[in-house]
From Swiss-Prot:
A lipid is attached at residue 23 (N-palmitoyl cysteine). InterPro entries: Lipoprotein_NlpA. SUPFAM superfamilies: Periplasmic binding protein-like II. GO terms for cellular component: plasma membrane. This is D-methionine-binding lipoprotein MetQ. The gene is metQ. It comes from the Bacteria.
Length: 271
């Protein structure tokens, strides 16, 4: 029994050391990187960056797709991926505050303006008293949406709320609108809900059903928005060669042209 235990222990130690060696080698490999992106239009843009990275920098980019805004940072923090490209700074800051992530921005990508869409009305003048307005429920995009609703005159928020107001900060609501908070991926489908008159949707999700801010939005966020998307990695990985190469590939003319094509002119260069 003692012999068997020693044998198993030795084998276990060997397997463990090989696994760790493999992980270390992969992390330090300047020619390979795993990047998290949101499935859909942003994935299409990232695929162009993937091609540029290979052709110009000899970097193999493995894209890992996600369907929501929470998992990409969780996966990055755990080391399952090396970087992600999907979020703006206010969202990243909130995630770091709430979850204690050691994440950092290493480059800017695009501003994807949010806009108000509807299948029930064509202008805000048609919005009836007591109408339901759907907005994203994550803190940063909720705040972003409420600030936009304020800018177009539908509501008024308390002074000094910054970038993260909530529905509780609404002090004036002339049309008695009912703010309905939904998961961001559900917002495009909410347009078919008979109860929802208007939905504020991020370009990433609006594009999945063929909507673009300039063409289909009843109102659109300004292009000088502070919500530029970022390429993010872990603090201990920010100087890695594979990360630097990916940032260079993403911030290329080819990717900019692809983003404008995919989003029908709805992508604003952020670098």
């Amino acid at each position: 029994m003692a012999f068997k235990f020693k044998t198993f222990a030795a084998v276990g130690a060997l397997i463990g050391s090989l696994a760790l060696a493999g992980c270390g080698q992969d992390e330090k490999d300047p020619n390979h990187i795993k990047v998290g992106v949101i499935v859909g239009a942003e994935q299409q843009v990232a695929e162009v960056a993937q091609k540029v990275a290979k052709e110009k920098y000899g970097l193999d980019v493995e894209l890992v797709t996600f369907n929501d805004y929470v998992l990409p940072n969780e996966a990055l923090s755990k080391g399952d991926i090396d970087a992600n490209a999907f979020q703006h700074k206010p969202y990243l800051d909130q995630q770091i505050k709430d979850r204690g992530y050691k994440l950092v921005s290493v480059g800017k990508t695009f501003v994807y303006p949010i806009a108000g869409y509807s299948k029930k009305i064509k202008s805000l003048d048609e919005l009836k008293d007591g109408s339901q307005v759907a907005v994203p429920n994550d803190p940063t995009n909720l705040g972003r949406s409420l600030l936009l609703l304020q800018k177009v005159g539908l509501i008024k928020l308390k002074d000094g709320v910054g970038l993260l107001p909530t529905s509780l900060d609404i002090v004036e609501n002339p049309k008695n609108l009912k703010i309905v908070e939904l998961e961001a991926p559900q917002l495009p489908r909410s347009l078919d809900d008979a109860q929802i008159a208007l939905a504020v949707i991020n370009t990433t999700y609006a594009s999945q059903i063929g909507l673009t801010p300039a063409k289909d939005g009843i109102f659109v966020e300004d292009k000088d928005s502070p919500y530029v998307n970022l390429i993010v990695t872990r603090e201990d990985n920010k100087d890695a060669e594979n990360v630097k190469k990916f940032v260079q590939a993403y911030q290329s003319d080819e990717v900019y042209e692809a983003a404008n094509k995919v989003f029908n002119g709805g992508a604003v260069k952020g670098w």
